[in-house]
Amino acid sequence: LGFVFIRFQAGPQPNIRHILRKFEEEVKQYELDKLLPSGDPFWQETVAANWKCVRDVDNEGYHVPLAHPGLHDLFGSNYYDEPLENGTNRSLGGFREGTNSLWSVKNYRSILSAKQTLDEAHKNAWLYIGVFPNMVLGLYPDSVIFYQEFPVENGKTIQRGASYRYAEEDRQMRLSRYLSMRIDRLTSKEDEQLIQWSWESAFSSAYDGVILSE
């Protein structure tokens, strides 16, 4: 798929290429082997919560309409998650029809310069592919991202990620990428609050011991 994965220790899991094989036809139109660094450094932050709280919030797309105004303005009711199967899951957010209301979303839609190798559906959608247990690839019409979490200790998690640009990026696509990253940054700040609430709820009298991120 264009990324290099290194196995540091032998284990029973199949290799990543095998795990992601079912997405090969859909993903090859993004030409991931031709991606270039965006110029932004890898980002990393420490989250004061158990890593499963972080993953639980990211896995559950049903909160998008209430918690993520930007994504809801972009997708409307067109966002859905597919269940985890054989170590991977897929989510797709198709851009909604009609006029957008938020500044970043409205301008993103109006100037979006999508990668020309994409079909019409993927020129108008954000695609996410998750790899169990802790990594997500985000495939956008204007760029590609990844992010992942690493548990440090109970109540402390490191989250890191990076963004990439398409080789043919011009000024308009670069501006599109800036706006999609702006939408993502706002979404990440909103997720921080959800993660905090999820972590704090585990210490409340109402917590019944449900297993997170099952």
PLM regions: where:
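C-terminal catalytic domain of Rieske-type non-heme iron oxygenases
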Residues: 2-214
